[in-house]
Design a protein with these regions (language model features):
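Active-site-proximal flexible loops/turns
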Residues: 21-23, 124-127
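Acidic carboxylate-rich catalytic motifs and surrounding loops in phosphoryl-/glycosyl-chemistry enzymes
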Residues: 15-17, 117-123
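Catalytic grooves of carbohydrate-active enzymes
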Residues: 4, 56-120
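Catalytic domains of cell-wall/extracellular-matrix polysaccharide-remodeling enzymes
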Residues: 1-68, 72, 96, 100
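Positions that flank functional sites
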Residues: 42-43, 88, 123
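Accessory recognition modules or surfaces
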Residues: 80, 125-132
């Protein structure tokens, strides 16, 4: 990939279709800071950096549950990785509409939760100040 992207340093990896194995996790954890699977959920406390959880914005996503998801994230002091395959007016079963993406981003922003790239969120999670 370096011949295409130059000096870009890739720090995260997403398992294709969520195909994860112990061998893949072992190999990829040496190549990337974090890897994301397709297991649904909020990332909290002890993070499995070789298989972070995510929330899929796809045909099955219930936009009415976003407030509950945000509330749970705040209560658990966690962070969410949202992913989708395409953003278009008539998305594939794995994508979402621009309106849904906007609604989710607006709800998260309005809640006061920071919106960050994965590597920045990881930095916050790994190097947050110790509180007493």
């Amino acid at each position: 990939v370096k011949h295409l992207l130059g000096d870009v340093i890739m720090t995260s990896f997403a398992y294709p279709q969520g195909n994860v194995s112990i061998g893949a996790k072992r190999f990829l954890s040496r190549k990337f800071s974090v890897c994301r699977g397709t297991q649904a959920g909020i990332n909290t406390k002890l993070l499995e950096l070789s298989q972070l959880k995510c929330v899929n914005l796809d045909a099955n996503f219930d936009k009415n549950s976003i407030d509950a998801l945000i509330k749970e994230t705040k209560v658990r002091n966690g962070w969410i990785i949202f992913n989708t395959h395409d953003v278009i007016d008539f998305p594939s079963p794995y994508g979402c509409t621009p309106e849904l993406l906007y609604a989710v981003v607006a709800a998260v922003a309005a809640s006061g939760i920071e919106i960050l790239p994965i590597k920045h969120a990881l930095g916050r999670a790994m190097f947050r100040p110790i509180t007493r």
